[in-house]
């Protein structure tokens, strides 16, 4: 920032007068004249970013004088000095910039009207008035039924907006010139709003409600009024711009997947179970006879087949389902019940909107799948209709589409935010530097003692400013009312002595850290006089620290500092001593934990006694916390007490607790009890991770201020738009979506419900509400609105939220904790306790030794221990004086302490002892932190790595540890002779066996076989006796093999090595389970419950594969490293959720019960059944039940389950409906009676779900980055082999540039080669591919035969065209065709297309397999993928995916392993549960395939609520324990609720929260890497482009072009290598080598243009080596070329020649003049002494040389000039006249080239160039010279 420092003070502000305008016009004229003279424009300046319109005036300018405020002033930005602008500065020092042109062509800037308008416009009250108007207007817009007088109010609003626009137009002008009304895009919004208001008022445009929606844009006006919002909207727009590539790729991928879906599943979702055969036998006979005779039914027949199958009464419906049951005709599809057959009939599911019948609906289905909204429904419908095999399609779409592309959007938004953040920080740093330079300048101006004081003040303030940049946002800093940091010295002082001594005064002045001295009265007066110059410039810095009004100090001294008398001060000291003791802190923490436990023990139903105990407990805890607050107030004084954040927090909670006790019996205020829960947050004081989480949320919410406002505006706008557009439709067409014609829960008829729908869309749930909307209001408008909310709100703004959250994580904050070297009081107390226990142990040990008569030899240590204990206790007493602040504000008080110790060196040495003791304590007890916060160990090699790095031992190690051998001498064996030698030989043999590769391979094979065997033990095993017997024997064999393996390893490795390896332990435990199970079977105890449950643990067998497969092992190692951090966050999340769970119990316990009709499962209305007793009375006469919602808030455990369902948005609707309908305990719920309970769920979703679940992504990414840096930046998810693949992929990315394909010598081939090499040909083929894609999109399920025929013919044409293209390329490119990857791809696609065309006929005729037919048709979609070839951005993203593949494969393996294990568990435990909710004949745990399908669904957290519900059935009447399962002895269809909840929760945490987030972490990292590579100035595409352009200039592939064509070639390149014409000078200066024949080599040109882009950097050197190496590799046989000259050298030679010519021509001119003079004197007979000889000799010599050595035009001209007769009386022309005279002379060279025209000037300068240029008198000499050069 090399800008000159602007002048300080107010002298820069000058009124804008007519003279100022004249001066601007003069400067503009001067600038244009200068440009004309110099012939080139000046470097464009940029306006100062500090002086932009809308920003505050920088403090360096000071405050403008009052009379210059709100007055037009001359522009202070140098950039605008030559532009017609002026500025006005408002009272808040905000800059406004206006055009000085007359507004509307008539109102000059000096007009009273315009000045008045400007004053109104910039006044803060005007902005406030407009803001209030907009907010009021927004309130009126939310009214669904506005009152009659609202029309008048509407006119008022329109009038106000018109007035605002008029003021703006009068003050700024309308649209001509800068800074006018329409030049600001935000004003377009105003213009549109006002125009629409008048248009709708005066022109009848029909649909009024639709036009009223335009009014909602007024809400966007808030963005124009609030300054910070414009910035954040700018950032959003930037992120959207950056998302274009990802968006294109996403849409392209969606289109491809939609086409695949269209081909595979077209029409499948209409296959329903139809009642068949028809009961009426006659109709059936008619139908049957017609079918047999192969004729269709006659229209006159009575039986209407179409009407029959479309009649819903003939279709099979499941209980409670809105759509008929789907089915399929393939073997693994859904089956129909008896009496029904599968036919295509009726409409598609979900009002007909879920289908693949045409491209549009298929695209919507795939978008829904990609955004994972209710995709389990689509998954279940498709698999039921098409078959389970098609799960593969969903796996690909979920992993590629949902996990990869959706997270790419997150990556792009995060990147855009980071860039924005970087730019902001850079700007702040620049300002800081400029400010510091200014301070230096100001300091230099000051002299004497005043100057020194001033500089001290400046430094102090400057340091404050620097600190503010790196503020840690800690709430724990102790500040006084001025906002200044209060030193400990003052906080802890309780004596009445308030004056500093002179010595202390001096010390405090000498310390730069103490900031108190400037506030002392005498000093501040002197300083003020010294700083009078700086007052204006420094004022901005004091904003944050403005002192309180003087009255407050008196008030504080009198009432807030309790220092009344000596006894009170003594009492206060004692209270301080007790309250600040670490043990009191420990006690309070224990009370907080106990209080939390007491609150968590509330449940329904509770016995009165238990309720009483909890009530008393609450009173006790409230008393304890109140007492703590009171004592702290006494100890610290209110003045200092309320300067600690935690104390304020405590006081608020205590006050609320006391208020709640007082209002305990008031109805409706029970919610106050919830505030007690906030005490849990007090744990954050002593729990760093919780503290850190709260800080992250705090920082994010702080940073999100503006973004939250933008999101609120978006939500508001869309809620109002929805209400205005669709509200009436919901009311009028409600019967379409509701059986009882009542409004459903989700509608847009009023603002609140409309807001809830928009919020639900932001949560990612949009499809179900959109179906309702489309049904009542039409598809098109609903699609547009819902998609806009989804894309803008969810994908952009919410991802920006997440990006902010991720950016809140810094390096080690989750694992390192608060490593500030100080411990909190809790740690000190625990340290004391442990030391006390150690001391007691030592005491007991010494007493025992004395009793036994041994003399203790540790007297010295004991003495030292006493000293240490004394020192530590003494230290603790010292710390008590520090109080609570010691652990709250360590980072800010350390420097102060250091300064004090510097000046107080002569104090008692006791303090230094304390310091030493303190240091010892901190070092020794750092482990206390590690129990809470995992700290990664120093980078030591892990066991596996050690094995890899060090040579493995050739012989077995010792069996036992040295300790064992010392204690048991018999374990020591001599291995040199006897039994010992035999034992040693046996061990060596075993060692050789287990180390052999064959043994390891065999064991892996056995593990895979035994795991595979488990998959067969499904529900059908009892019916397959043979398989069951085989599996039983196999199980025994596997067990024996694994036991033998374990014994071999014991003998080979020894117990020491075996049992110190974690993987061996895993093997040992799994073998033990098999062993116990086998033993129990042999003894006949296999039916025991314990043994049965133990048998399920066999599912862990596949875990043994972990250590054998390196790919999985590296992922598990990385995961194990992350477990402490993940566990930490999980614990913090559980604490966070505990608050919401307890609150839920307080609000909803026992209130979810309701009375239902057991036959219809519907709730009985409240007017029939009011409460539980009414229901019980009905129970004896009717089929009714008083039931609870299965997932509820009756206790904290169930509350947690409810919150997990809400956080994953699965099953949350039922919970929310129950909450909103709830009344009181034992009362029948009523529809939406408790409407605002929705807010509980909204708040939890924001804080509990959004923040905490996304925290997992943050912690995983953060932890893996740490591990990566620990291992030196290596990828921790890849094996060594995979790293080789990764590097190979990287090399492929930077592949060598192919050698240009030589043009064939054959004429016809050459013509074809030229044709296919043209860009037009590529564009033509791309257009055809797009058209082909369009024709595929046109296909529909119910298309006519004609349409099908036409599409078939079109497809035929495309196949012919693409085949022709392939043949042409093969013909022209010869063998080189297959050297290009894309050509091979095209070739394969063409072959497949032809094969598909031929096979489709054969399949249709001979094999009726529609599935196979469809799969073959997919080959056509391959053509679409060719489009990728043309898109650089998309290739980058796909390359990032290719780079991610090895790591993703490893994670996929781990995920499959987890799914495998859990599916075996599921088969063991949940195979026989009742089929209801999410469990049916396809989705269940009966077989391994079904289990895998269910678990794949849950991997994305989808549908787990439906699978859990049947498992929660624990007994009658929900399920039947005696239910007989056919084909097996197992009875009952009840679930196991405890096991089910554990199973699903653990799987969701492991897969959805951990493994899937690892997947996301890898994608983000690889995307960043790919972006960094593509963000390089040059990439491989640029070099490819260079080659393509080169081929056009060097058709014969000689690798050379002529020097004259160089300039055209470089101009023909694309950015960034292109150098546009005129480029002659630039290229000449590049010093490019030229070889014989005036030719230049391609490599030299490439190096030159590359250097131009990269500059002389290290990258350039590397690039040069790479290019040269590749060239040598590509052209091993090419002849070497030696440059004879370079472009720059040639130019220098030309210049030298011209210089010589110029000198010589001057000499000739002088000669000619002398000759003329000689001739004249001769005629006049006047002789000169020197005129002995005529001066023509040189001319004669030159003429002779010209004759001998060829024609030289310059010389010829000179000679001609020399011999041309001159008039005797002619005067030599003036230089200016000669300059304006031009002549164009062209002379032929001997080689036949044209030479340059000669330009005649006063110096007779003759220049040459390779082109002929005709000069005319109007052209500027300088311009022509430059163009020639």
Curated annotation (Swiss-Prot):
It is found in: Cell membrane. III repeats lie at residues 979-1292. CDD domains: Na_channel_gate. Keywords: Cell membrane, Disulfide bond, Glycoprotein, Ion channel, Ion transport, Membrane, Repeat, Sodium, Sodium channel, Sodium transport, Transmembrane, Transmembrane helix, Transport, Voltage-gated channel. IV repeats lie at residues 1301-1599. It holds the Pfam family Ion_trans. GO terms for biological process: membrane depolarization during action potential; neuronal action potential. Residues 446-467, 923-933 have a biased composition (Polar residues). Residues 359-383, 751-771, 1197-1218, 1488-1510 dip into the membrane without crossing it. Residues 902-916, 939-957 have a biased composition (Acidic residues). One of its GO terms (molecular function) is voltage-gated sodium channel activity. The chain crosses the membrane at residues 125-143, 151-171, 186-203, 210-226, 246-265, 391-411, 583-601, 613-632, 647-666, 669-686, 703-721, 783-801, 999-1016, 1030-1048, 1063-1081, 1090-1108, 1126-1145, 1236-1257, 1321-1338, 1350-1368, 1381-1398, 1412-1428, 1448-1465, 1541-1563. Residues 1693-1722 form the IQ domain. Residues 1276-1278 are annotated as: Important for rapid channel inactivation. Gene3D superfamilies: 1.10.287.70, EF-hand, iswi atpase, Voltage-gated potassium channels. Chain C. Glycans are attached at residues 207, 280, 293, 329, 1157, 1171. It is a multi-pass membrane protein. II repeats lie at residues 564-836. InterPro entries: Ion_trans_dom, Na_channel_asu, Na_chnl_inactivation_gate, Na_trans_assoc_dom, VGCC_Ca_Na, Volt_channel_dom_sf. It catalyses: Na(+)(in) = Na(+)(out). Pore-forming subunit of a voltage-gated sodium (Nav) channel that directly mediates the depolarizing phase of action potentials in excitable membranes. Navs, also called VGSCs (voltage-gated sodium channels) or VDSCs (voltage-dependent sodium channels), operate by switching between closed and open conformations depending on the voltage difference across the membrane. In the open conformation they allow Na(+) ions to selectively pass through the pore, along their electrochemical gradient. Belongs to the sodium channel (TC 1.A.1.10) family. Nav1.4/SCN4A subfamily. This is Sodium channel protein type 4 subunit alpha A. It comes from Danio rerio. The gene is scn4aa.
